[in-house]
Every structure is written in structure tokens, then in C-alpha cells.
């Protein structure tokens, strides 16, 4: 989405959001930064190890699909141009993650989640609601989301085969970006979310990570 002060009509906004959805779900994402795993050799994985790596990288890819949807929903409803710019920058970095995960999945011979259209739609609606609740709570939603994502990624680093250095390097870089996104949201005026909202977010994330691992 635009990070300038231009005002879009409802129709313009709908077209832009539809385009963003189609690009995320059906396009080939282009990273602005170099893949951190570039130059690393392909590991010799057993069939079981490869299946495990595919599962976790598929989860990470779906997580990035959700991140794109969340940020676009929040961008569409952000009131402060500075907050909108923060979401725009974060979304661009999440596009890097999306591209890296998709590239790694292709290298492993895996497929992206067949449920990505559902993940995107659900996350976009959540992003809209978060944005409509006001910028402080919307920023709080980002901060809490990134905290939970960082925990998931740390868990993945414990479970991805130790010799799959390519997948591990990508996840490590993603983890650092997510931590920074959370810190940026906090420094921009994030308001802490209610406990029940945090628990609901964790439950939804658990559903996504469980299903995306297999489907």
C-alpha cells in the first residue's frame, strides 16, 4: 500500500487490496534482500528429515501469507501516515520472508499450503478490525503477533534438522526481523492487548501452524 498521503477512494482501495491478495497467493514474490541461505550447499537429508523441513518451511510460508494480509488490512485502516509507513516497511520485509520460504520449499520439493487463500482472507479481516480499533491497539496487535511468531520460529529452530543449514539460516534471519518489527511497533506507541485477545491470537496461530504443516 502507499506510504504517502494520497487518499484512495473505497473502490481504489478495494482494487489495490485485491491486487495485493492475488500477488501474494498466486504471484512469485520478489525479495529486495538477498536470500540469507544463498551460497550454502544443499544438505543431504533423509526422506524423514526432508519431510520435516518441508513441513516447517510450509508453516513459515503460510505465516508470511498471513503477515502480508494482516499488514495490508492494517494499512488500509491506519489513521496516522507514520503508522501506515511503518506497516508498509514491515510488509516489504515480510515479502522477503515469503520469497525465501517459497524458494526453499521449491528446493526441498515441497508445496505451499493449499489453505493459503483461507489464511489470507482470515488474516486480512483481522487486520482490518485491528486497524479500525485505532492505531495504538493496531500497533499492539503487531507487537503481540511478532512476539508469538518469534516463539514459533525459535521452536522451529529446535526442530528443523540440524544439518539443514539452508532452512535454518532463513528462519534465523526471519526471527531477527520479527523481533525488530515488534520493537518498532512498541516504540511507535503500541498499546498492550487484553489477555483474552492474546490467548485467542495464540489459539488461531496454533490452528494455522498445525494444519499448514500437513496441508
From Swiss-Prot:
It is a peripheral membrane protein. One of its GO terms (cellular component) is plasma membrane. One of its GO terms (molecular function) is metal ion binding. Pathway: Cofactor biosynthesis; ubiquinone biosynthesis. Fe cation 2 binds at residues 94, 146, 178, 181. It comes from the Bacteria. Binds 2 iron ions per subunit. It is an enzyme of class 1 (oxidoreductase). Belongs to the COQ7 family. This is 3-demethoxyubiquinol 3-hydroxylase.
Amino acid at each position: 500500500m502507499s506510504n504517502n498521503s494520497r487518499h484512495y477512494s473505497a473502490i481504489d482501495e478495494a482494487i489495490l487490496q485485491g491486487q495485493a491478495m492475488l500477488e501474494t497467493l498466486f504471484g512469485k514474490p520478489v525479495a529486495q534482500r538477498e536470500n540469507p541461505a544463498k551460497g550454502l550447499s544443499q544438505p543431504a537429508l533423509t526422506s524423514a528429515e526432508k519431510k520435516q523441513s518441508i513441513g516447517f518451511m510450509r508453516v513459515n510460508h503460510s505465516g508470511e501469507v498471513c503477515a502480508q494480509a494482516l499488514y495490508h488490512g492494517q494499512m488500509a485502516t491506519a489513521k496516522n501516515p507514520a503508522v501506515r509507513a511503518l506497516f508498509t516497511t514491515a510488509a516489504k520485509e515480510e515479502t522477503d520472508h515469503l520469497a525465501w520460504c517459497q524458494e526453499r520449499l521449491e528446493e526441498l520439493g515441497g508445496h505451499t499450503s493449499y489453505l493459503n487463500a483461507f489464511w489470507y482472507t482470515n488474516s486480512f479481516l483481522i487486520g482490518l478490525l485491528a486497524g479500525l480499533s485505532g492505531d495504538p491497539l493496531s500497533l499492539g496487535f503487531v507487537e503481540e503477533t511478532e512476539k508469538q511468531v518469534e516463539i514459533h520460529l525459535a521452536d522451529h529452530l529446535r526442530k528443523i534438522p540440524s544439518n539443514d543449514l539452508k532452512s535454518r539460516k532463513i528462519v534465523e534471519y526471519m526471527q531477527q526481523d520479527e523481533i525488530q518489527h515488534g520493537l518498532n511497533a512498541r516504540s511507535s506507541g503500541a498499546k498492550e492487548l487484553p489477555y483474552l485477545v492474546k490467548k485467542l491470537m495464540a489459539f488461531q496461530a496454533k490452528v494455522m501452524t498445525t494444519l499448514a504443516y500437513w496441508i
